[in-house]
């Protein structure tokens, strides 16, 4: 992939997504155009049903837009066939979910290397060295032979992050990664993600409802009614994020009452 210093790692152009369950059309995204900067942590927030999860799914190629285009670097992924899109996700995109999604019968080491198994190959020497670096930085060296049920929630999520980073993805998507963790483990996970951006140049898009989690971001995008409503790029704090969310909720309530 070719990207310059200012080239977005991912971008949407005039993207809409309409779901049509049983003939009742629901617009989840409406004409969204958005650039995601490389080597930054971008948080996406919004009220329930605002479209933030759909935005992430479309960006990650997990869902196709009804209209518009999605690019990963210079490649338009909306044109890809399903099998090519699956291969792209496996090789160039990392995922971290709230529920960890570890394979219970595999050890930590096997879970981390799972993306290579799914790609029907073994990691090369430089990839093994990278995995060792990630394992060390995430403090998992003494847990490699353990299975998920022998780990704490924080250790399970660290394993999931290591798995997501193992292939050195162009971009990592995290959906409520601290949602199942206690406050201490949540802080540790967000510190790891911040370090991945700062030390490894990793690009991360994070969906969360928690202002404390979002405050780790370099940029916070607020989604309302299927479109970006506003964003924060400077002076990002839990208080500023909570205040912005309150303003969005109040505007929505005012619109409904008219």
Label each PLM-derived region with a short phrase.
Residues 68-76:
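Conserved ABC transporter NBD signature motif
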Residues 106-115:
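Short coil-to-helix segment of the ABC ATPase nucleotide-binding domain corresponding to the Q-loop/switch region
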Residues 60:
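Helix-to-loop junction immediately C-terminal to a conserved catalytic motif
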Residues 147-157:
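Conserved ABC ATPase signature
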Residues 75-76, 120, 124-142:
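Conserved ABC ATPase "signature" region
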Residues 168:
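Conserved catalytic motifs of ABC-family nucleotide-binding domains
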Residues 172-175:
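Catalytic Walker B motif of ABC-type/P-loop ATPase nucleotide-binding domains
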